[in-house]
């Protein structure tokens, strides 16, 4: 039985055909249907020109007229209807801004990247598969349409798509396709970092990131980005083996970067180069920084807490301080990584004992934090100033507030206004602020 979204797609096909145009389902939906995978969206290719599509349907959006794409809206669903086209002249190893409309489905399929993405279905459900996409999928192979060198030279992004599809669908890259990919990897320098990031994000969020990372490493393609990435230092020895078990993108990226051994500043720099959002950069940075704080804290005066109770106390202290500095979310990220690979910390400078203590107590420690941000303190900067006669505002205020937060969070000082102010007075006097 067809779902509503699929029925809608066939309605669009039929309507186009009744007007004398050719129309087919194409691309990802055909591939995913053959594989009995859920279809995300139905794309349609037609001999009708964009203006004709606009005229024919009641609700349309002129999504990309210069590329021949009109979005047709039926009920709650959107269908991208694209005029048969070929991509005449590729410029600078990227897909061209201009396309040429054509009359033949076959030529339209020919410009597509991989055989499994170059199949079509007509309105009766007949498969049109001129390049043997179905057989390739059955043999577990990912293969370029036609000459792989030409395909990758036309559009270098296809090399990253190749690695993504191979990992996502568990396919081996066919030999000539792989050879061409390795030979042309240096063409990746023509691709904007943003597009590289989008492909990498999908690989990392995907079903088998380790496979994708393995292919990235063995092709050497990460060394060929337009702007250099520290991520390119990845090698087979430090693969984040349990990455597919992590649910969140932040945790996956943190785990990946930490596995390579990058410090927080290097991670931040790579993520900036890759044009990640400021918020995601901050979150991953904080998780990494919290991890390194824990590691450095443990390395300091190591001999003082070889005994379990002392080690536990020390860890609790560092964990809570880390939560104040970098936020609870940072530790949850580290905690989740540890939970999927308990021995992970061992190869990153933290003993197995410490790791297992963190794993058994870490959540409790976070819950036990009565306060974790200045906002929750029962005293603010203004009140502090009001109680400190003759003192003018200055950096000392922040210093005092941070001290109060730390003492309260660690359970050494109740979060009560008068006690907080008394402690503040002591602190100012003692430190000569
Ligand atoms: P998914 O959406 O799951 O990534 P998809 O196959 O639908 O898979 P899209 O990027 O949505 O991928 O593209 C739709 C179709 O357009 C592809 O199946 C392919 O036929 C064609 N296509 C997309 N990008 C390229 C490209 N860079 N070079 C050649 N053909 C492409
Ligand atoms: Mg798609």
What do the PLM-derived regions correspond to, one by one?
Residues 1-433:
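Catalytic cores of the polymerase beta-like nucleotidyltransferase superfamily
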